């Protein structure tokens, strides 16, 4: 396998395209999901206004077009933008037809205008992105890449390191270390963990891991999910699991249906008891949120107990408050369209646009903390938004952040012009990253950077400051790996010619 990697790199782009059978299977799954979404939005929401349904359908259509282009083989390379667009299904489209308590406070005409805004944003972004991915670029003369055996071992080491970091952090054993240092270490480990999960899941889908490597990867992945969920924050585990599924789908060209169902059932079940756990360990006086590793069984047993209690109570009580934190659904918690609705309702008449205030801080966020001990928080832009729209005081925003997402932030800064500018920027960035990673092996600098872009593309609540700071820090780490561990290798044209002939 090592020799094959040295002379015959595994490209992201396939020559020819994936076998027609697999392509057809992928398209069938796409159409089943698409028709299911449209049916839900049109027929299963009797209490929803026609204008709200129209807004949801517009967003859904625009969200699915990039995925159709990729599934049908018209778009090449890594599907960064398609997966980014899909996040708008649960963050923007479904909340319009799911009786979201905050979204319902706005008029149906506001829903339609928001839907048109999102659809226009995604449509323009798709046009820009498609320009870069509709054709295959010439092969590079060389690339920098990890040796495949060393690369797999390196990322297995990263995963176990991530598990140990979670354990130490959950137990409070890192409290003596400077907060700024911990933030840098955490960001680095999170970025490398995302890369490791994607690379190893991709290799698992290609059946290029040995039995031992495959078992270790699955074991470390489960351990990572367990230790990250101990914090009572499900978003981290959900993101890692989603990244693993995406990578597997890209390489195997099949949906792991059973794994997805098991994951959704577990996360949904834990969600039921999360509120009680947070109330007891986050907000109660004299309580501690630190959990020692030997207490994990008791911790999860208690959590499971609260979830079962909620389910049993829900069966016997039909009138539970639908807007309570405990009752909040996945769609309600993941939604950010209410922030766009707020910005469109208030600006520019009642509250002025920010005119780039949340973007002006970006250069400062790129300065390493070691060079600026008073460096501002990456969430500073989010605080500016929440204070400006009177959602929080600055002190409150430091303790708890209300996420806006890139699109709502762009509207709050410049209105529709800001949304259009963001579409062009993201379409270009994701398109260029995708094109750059075509014809590059999975462990090359180009592909790892594209994986990094994908891992951040579905962080739907990130403001520009958080997004740029996290991407810059992780990119710096990849650059360091490239300089220290990667070697310059020439591309073997015979490998690609061989792929074309198969």
Regions found by a protein language model. Give the residues of each.
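Membrane-interfacial loop-to-transmembrane alpha-helix junctions, especially the N-terminal start
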Residues: 21-31, 74-87, 147-157, 208-217, ...
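Hydrophobic alpha-helical segments
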Residues: 390, 396-502
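Long extracytoplasmic/lumenal interhelical loops at the membrane interface
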Residues: 348-414
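N-terminal "leader" segments that precede or initiate the main folded domain
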Residues: 1-142, 244-249, 253-269, 470-481, ...
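Aromatic-rich transmembrane-lumenal/periplasmic boundary elements in polytopic membrane proteins
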Residues: 262-377
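Hydrophobic, membrane-inserted alpha-helices
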Residues: 35-39, 62-65, 195-200, 216-225, ...
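Aromatic-anchored segments of alpha-helical transmembrane domains
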Residues: 34-41, 85-96, 159-168, 219-229, ...
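Membrane-embedded catalytic interface detector for glycan/lipid assembly enzymes
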Residues: 127-285, 491-497
């Amino acid at each position: 396998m090592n020799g094959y990697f040295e002379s015959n790199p595994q490209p992201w782009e396939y020559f020819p395209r994936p076998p027609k059978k697999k392509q057809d299977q992928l398209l069938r799954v796409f159409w089943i999901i698409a028709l299911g979404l449209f049916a839900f939005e049109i027929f299963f929401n009797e209490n929803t206004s026609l204008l709200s349904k129209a807004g949801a359908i517009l967003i859904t259509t625009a969200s699915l077009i990039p995925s159709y282009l990729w599934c049908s083989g018209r778009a090449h390379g890594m599907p960064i933008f398609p997966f980014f667009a899909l996040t708008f299904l649960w963050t923007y489209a479904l909340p319009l037809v799911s009786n979201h308590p905050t979204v319902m406070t706005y008029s149906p005409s506001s829903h339609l205008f928001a839907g048109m805004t999102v659809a226009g944003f995604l449509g323009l972004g798709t046009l820009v992105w498609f320009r870069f991915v509709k054709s295959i670029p010439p092969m590079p003369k060389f690339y920098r890449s990890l040796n495949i055996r060393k690369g797999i071992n390196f990322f297995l080491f990263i995963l176990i390191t991530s598990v140990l970091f979670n354990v130490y952090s959950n137990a409070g054993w890192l409290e003596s270390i400077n907060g700024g240092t911990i933030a840098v270490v955490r960001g680095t480990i999170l970025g490398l963990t995302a890369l490791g999960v994607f690379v190893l899941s991709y290799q698992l889908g290609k059946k290029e891991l040995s039995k031992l490597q495959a078992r270790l990867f699955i074991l470390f992945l489960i351990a990572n999910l367990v230790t990250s969920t101990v914090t009572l924050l499900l978003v981290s585990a959900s993101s890692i699991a989603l990244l693993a599924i995406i990578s597997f789908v890209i390489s195997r060209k099949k949906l792991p249906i059973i794994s997805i169902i098991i994951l959704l059932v577990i996360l949904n079940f834990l969600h039921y008891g999360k509120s009680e756990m947070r109330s007891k360990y986050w907000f109660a006086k004299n309580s501690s949120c630190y959990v020692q590793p030997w207490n994990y069984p008791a911790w999860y047993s208690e959590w499971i107990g609260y979830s079962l209690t909620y389910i049993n109570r829900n069966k016997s009580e039909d009138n539970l408050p639908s807007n309570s934190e405990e009752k909040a659904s996945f769609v309600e918690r993941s939604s950010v369209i209410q922030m766009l609705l707020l910005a469109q309702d208030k600006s520019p008449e009642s509250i002025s646009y920010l005119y780039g205030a949340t973007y002006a801080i970006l250069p400062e966020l790129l300065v390493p903390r070691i060079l600026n001990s008073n460096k501002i928080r990456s969430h500073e832009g989010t605080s500016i938004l929440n204070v400006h729209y009177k959602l929080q005081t600055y002190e409150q925003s430091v303790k708890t952040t209300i996420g806006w997402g890139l699109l709502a932030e762009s509207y709050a800064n410049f209105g529709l012009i800001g949304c259009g500018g963001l579409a062009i920027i993201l379409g270009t960035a994701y398109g260029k990253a995708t094109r750059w990673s075509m014809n590059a092996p999975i462990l090359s600098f180009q592909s790892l950077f594209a994986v990094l872009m994908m891992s951040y593309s579905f962080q739907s609540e990130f403001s520009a400051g958080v997004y740029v700071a996290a991407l810059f820090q992780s990119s710096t780490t990849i650059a360091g790996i490239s300089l220290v561990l990667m070697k310059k290798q020439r591309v073997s044209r015979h490998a690609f010619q061989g792929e074309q002939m198969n």
